[in-house]
Design a protein with these regions (language model features):
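A short acidic, Gly/Pro-enriched loop at the edge of an enzyme's catalytic core
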Residues: 105-118
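Class I SAM-dependent methyltransferase SAM/SAH-binding core
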Residues: 44-107
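A short SAM/SAH-binding and catalytic strip from SAM-dependent methyltransferases
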Residues: 116-130, 153
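Conserved alpha-helix/loop element of class I SAM-dependent methyltransferases that forms part
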Residues: 24-43, 58
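Short glycine-dipeptide loop
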Residues: 65-66, 141-146
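N-terminal, positively charged/glycine-rich alpha-helical extensions of SAM-dependent methyltransferases
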Residues: 1-18
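Conserved Class I S-adenosyl-L-methionine
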Residues: 3, 52-54, 181-274
């Protein structure tokens, strides 16, 4: 894999999305994740990859004034949106930090802290080594505390995983790592077990709440005017090759009309520290 700074790449991707991020399925899904966590008044919560504060604010309401929520995200743009929400809602039980969620031991604000619940919503697939991350996160749980984390179904959001395959074939970085979860819920369960967590339950939930047909041509344009996530593949010297490889990978998935019906499914794990 070509050298690049994965946390920086992710920061760039989400800085560009910050102002429009909430105009999507993300608010509904974040609320659902917090509901699954079953937070109680007085609990302490760590919200990793907190983004614009969607789950953070829901968690703040759930734990009430005697609880606390710490949000961590690499994207300054996303955190700016979250901070604006905190000011608008006058919340005093939340603190936010700009930092990589893969290196929490270097975040001084977390020194000595333990949490009743750790949330990571829609972000595990952004990590190059998610297993190592979950192992580290588990050390921040109180005894009996739980982690709530999700990965999308291998047949969901197929354009993204196709770009990832093209990136591997071109030896160029694409800042997501869904190929780590080819077995879906099985890989997620194993990751939690390897982190020493127990009482693991895996739920299958809807993400966008509708089936979706996707068309090849809708995504080839991402290489003509590349987003931050596809910028390496959209460079002029590689763009046409990347398009051909995308078409090749797409053909392995598509029907005779060149379309794919995606599976609207996310696997959510709830796993406890003994």
């Amino acid at each position: 894999m070509a050298l690049h700074d994965q946390p920086l790449d992710i920061g760039d991707v989400y800085n560009s999305r910050a102002e429009s991020y909430d105009n999507s399925w993300h608010p509904r899904f974040a609320r659902h994740m917090v509901e699954i966590a079953k937070l109680k008044p007085g609990e302490d919560v760590l919200d990793l990859a907190c983004g614009t504060g969607l789950a953070t604010l829901c968690a703040s309401t759930a734990v009430q004034e005697h609880g606390s929520v710490v949000g961590v995200d690499i994207s300054g743009g996303m955190l700016a949106q979250a901070k604006h929400k905190l000011q608008s809602h006058d919340l005093n039980n939340v603190e936010l930090h700009q930092h990589s969620i893969t290196d929490l031991d270097r975040l001084l604000a977390l020194n000595g802290k333990k949490f009743d619940a750790i949330l990571c919503c829609s972000a595990l697939v952004l990590l190059r080594d998610p297993g190592a991350a979950v192992k580290q996160w588990a050390t921040y749980l109180k005894p009996g505390g739980r982690i709530v984390v999700d990965v999308i179904h291998p047949r969901d959001q197929l354009p993204g995983i196709t770009f990832e395959k093209v990136g591997k074939r071109c030896n160029l970085p694409v800042p997501f790592y869904r190929l780590n979860f080819g077995a879906g819920s099985g890989d997620l369960r194993q990751m939690c077990e390897d982190a020493g967590l127990s009482r693991i339950s895996i739920l299958s939930v809807s993400q966008i709440d509708r089936p979706e047909l996707v068309d090849l041509n809708d995504f080839l344009t991402d290489l003509d005017a590349p987003r931050p996530s596809t910028r390496h593949l959209g460079r002029s010297q590689i763009r046409e090759e990347a398009k051909m490889l995308f078409k090749d990978e797409w053909a392995k998935l598509a029907d005779e009309q060149g379309k794919i019906k995606q599976v609207d499914c996310v696997f959510v794990a709830v796993a406890y520290r003994s």
